[in-house]
Amino acid sequence: MKKEYINTGKCIWCGKEKPEVSFYTAPHIVPKCLGGEEIGKDICDDCNHAFGTAIQGSPSVDAMFREVFEAYRFFLQLRTNEIKDSRRYKSCLFSYFRKTRTFKINNSYSINALTRQFKRSVFEVFLQKYHLVTNDGNNPKFQAVRDFARYNIGDLRLFYTFNNILLTENTPLGFDENVTFFMTPKMIDTMERTGFYSLYLFGHNFYLEVLPFTASMAGDQYLSTEANTMLVRAKGNESIRLVTSLRDIDIFLDRFVK
């Protein structure tokens, strides 16, 4: 009998149930090529396929997550001398120029389109991980996440912790290491109180506005408090910054090049 990846049998994205939709495709939460082993539940084959399909003017949502975090991992290895030569970096989307510390987009995509697809990808992995842990991904309170990540409707804020040190503790560097991110009861409680979920992966910390109404009331104070503990004051430009462009998240870790 063919394996199904279900708990409730109701897709957390489109809300459809068996037999209207099927659940036979293994939905990796973090892409397997990045070392992700966790398999999500209740993501129907149609929605799983949609996240992996390019749309006109943009690469797929899943491709953007993979490209950004592959770059993060490679250049983290480069900056920590695990890898010696930046010319080993290969990407379908980006060309990186070591001498000028600049990059170009290899296709006709705009940086705005790539930024939006990346943001959608981060919210995708959030809800799939949340559902795996809580079995509550169909909760109506996440409708804004579903609209944005799955259907490209509306917008949600994403913030990035910009530090001038490498946060490598508990960060898998090898390309064969198992990669995951945490979803603890404490983190869920913080999310319920502030509207934000904190995602830490490959040494980078993001804050996702997953409950916009709650975030509108308590989010600014939460981010201000987080800045006091998460930022290491070194050069004076450290901040928890709103992501409006891929340049805001320093994919190639150029701030660590001397």
Where are these regions (language model features)?
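Short, flexible, mixed-charge glycine/proline-rich loop motifs
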Residues: M1-T8, C33-E38
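Short cysteine-rich clusters marking metal-coordination/redox-active sites
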Residues: C11-C14, C44
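Short flanking/linker segments adjacent to small metal-binding domains or redox-active Cys/His motifs
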Residues: S86-R116
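C-terminal, charged low-complexity interaction regions
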Residues: Q117-K258
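Conserved C-terminal region and hinge/linker of Rieske [2Fe-2S] proteins, especially
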Residues: E82-I83
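Histidine-centered nuclease catalytic patch
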Residues: K18-G40
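Short Cys/His-centered divalent metal-binding micro-motifs
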Residues: D42-R79
